[in-house]
Amino acid sequence: MEEIIDVKNPKEVIEYLNNIDVDEYVEIYFGRVHVEGRLMHYNDGLIRLVHEKYGIIEVEIEKILDDLLELVHSNGEKRVVLRFY
């Protein structure tokens, strides 16, 4: 099942990330960049994802808020797409 949520205030992504469990799948699209992986850690705007080929990827969410296009979260049963455009 997929749910699409249009977000008006990008800071809502910070609240959303607080509710994602460790080891759930996250994709972040910002500017011309796309990062994805399993959530390893999230705290105070810093997200760490584990990608099977590239290892640990760290992104400071607050620094990319202006360029954020989509955040996708999947827990295996449900896929949620937060759109910022």
UniProtKB/Swiss-Prot annotation:
Organism: Methanocaldococcus jannaschii (strain ATCC 43067 / DSM 2661 / JAL-1 / JCM 10045 / NBRC 100440)
Classification via Pfam families: DUF2097 (PF09870)
Classification lineage: Archaea, Methanobacteriati, Methanobacteriota, Methanomada group, Methanococci
Top-level taxon of origin: Archaea
Protein name according to UniProt: Uncharacterized protein MJ0540
